[in-house]
Regions:
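Hydrophobic alpha-helical scaffolding
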Residues: 41-44, 48, 132, 195-199, ...
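Alpha-helical packing segments of well-folded alpha/beta enzyme cores
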Residues: 17, 54, 58, 205-208, ...
């Protein structure tokens, strides 16, 4: 009998912690909303909307056996172990700096109490500590990281099957909250606008991957650069919340080449984008101040402007620049923005308005359903020119907006 602590792994398939916990006989699956340790990195409002609906879907898959709680995970897990006489806990690792510190402390303290903790990699293809240069230092440039550190390393783990049967321990002495008591949904109607643009949950994630591979990966290499085209996977929120594993996505695309489907350039490009996701998490692991400090220290004295009117106009999609405003309005309405548009609106903020990249990072954190601490902070530093493998600070993002400005999000039809 064991506890399976759910974090950013809201799925049954290819879930190492769940699979191993299930072998102990029976499990108690618990999700804990950590409001103690996350501090300034607590999930943003759009992310909370997604999390609410995704937890609801996962609970259905668990036959409504999922336990919900809110507070300090160490206290809650300790209480649950005591009340149900459990001495084993399983979880999949997460890699935000505050999570790493918390989990290390919990693991050490549980060991002192005679409780065994088992942790697994369920969210990355390669562990950060396994990808280092010959001199033992971390990479700061993507291409050698990806080609030498990843593609020439041990192949990622193949996806695991979903457990055929899960036995649930009947919890008698611990009171679960309801999903609604987690208070994830904002009071205003914005949440309905956000969620109406998406199908949420593990089954939706698998369907999205299958649809992408079937109809949209052909032409991905070039099409991904044009917001008006559909050559993007839109898998980022599903990956962030662990509704699908990166291993499942990786091998679904990798195996297209093995089976003779002739989209080699498109599949290679998509896999390299998966590599960028890995690289972002890798950078955050080795440079934990990435969300708030310039990776390149020479930018520390840059003379940023501090203009709240400019910032508000950018946030509201009222800059007067059609492609920027279309992107920002799409973000507010759907919780998502095409990656090319993220580069354009980000470049406009830091290089045209001269506002600090942290302002953009904070706004995206609150508005994106796929807001990921690693990707968000490394992406903004890349745009500003102060990060790893960054675009030159004087290079301004450009794009033809002719088609985009006719989109439903543009205020200038």
């Amino acid at each position: 009998m064991s506890i399976y602590w759910i974090r950013q792994d809201l799925r049954l398939s290819d879930n190492p912690a769940l699979s191993e916990a299930n072998k102990t006989g029976s499990i108690i699956p618990i999700f804990i909303l950590d409001i103690v340790n996350s501090k300034e990195h607590i999930t943003g409002n759009a992310g909370k909307v997604w999390l609410h609906y995704s937890l609801n879907e996962l609970n259905k898959q668990f036959g409504n056996k999922l336990i919900f709680s809110k507070g300090d995970p160490e206290e809650i897990l300790t209480d649950l172990c005591k009340s149900e006489l459990i001495n084993k806990i399983f979880w999949n690792r997460v890699y935000e700096p505050w999570s790493i510190s918390r989990d290390k402390r919990i693991k050490e303290n549980m060991k002192k109490k005679g409780i065994e903790v088992n942790t697994f990699n369920g969210s990355l293809l390669w562990e950060p500590w396994n990808v280092l240069k010959n001199d033992g230092t971390p990479y700061k440039v993507f291409t050698p990281y990806y080609r030498r550190g990843c593609l020439n390393a041990v192949e990622p783990r193949r996806p695991l099957e979903k457990p055929k049967k899960i036995n649930f321990h009947e919890v008698k002495n611990f009171k679960s909250l309801s999903i609604n008591q987690l208070n994830l949904l904002p009071a205003h109607s914005w949440k309905e606008k956000i969620i109406s643009s998406w199908n949420v949950g593990e089954n939706a994630a698998k369907n999205r991957l299958n649809e992408f591979v079937k109809t949209e990966i052909e032409g991905y290499k070039e099409g991904r650069n044009f917001p008006s085209k559909k050559n993007v996977s839109r898998l980022s929120p599903h990956l962030h919340w662990g509704e699908i594993s990166p291993n499942t996505v990786w091998f679904k695309v990798w195996d297209l080449n093995k089976f003779g489907i002739n989209h080699q350039q498109d599949t290679d490009t998509f896999l390299s984008e998966m590599g960028w996701r890995e690289f972002s998490n890798y950078l955050l692991f080795y440079f934990p101040d990435l969300p708030k400090k310039n990776l390149q220290k020479k930018f520390d004295n840059f003379a940023w402007d501090d203009n709240p009117l400019f910032l508000k106009a950018w946030q509201n999609g009222q800059t007067g620049y059609p492609i920027v405003d279309a992107g920002m309005r799409e973000l507010w309405s759907t919780g998502y923005m095409h990656n090319r548009l993220r580069m354009i609106v980000g470049s406009f903020l830091v290089k045209n308005l001269l506002l600090h990249w942290c302002e953009g990072e904070r706004w995206f954190w609150d508005c994106l359903v796929d807001a990921n601490l690693a990707s968000n902070s490394s992406g903004w530093q890349w745009i500003a020119g102060c990060g790893a493998d960054a675009a030159p600070y004087f290079k301004i993002g450009r794009a033809s907006c002719r088609e985009r400005c006719r989109s439903r999000w543009s205020p200038y039809h």
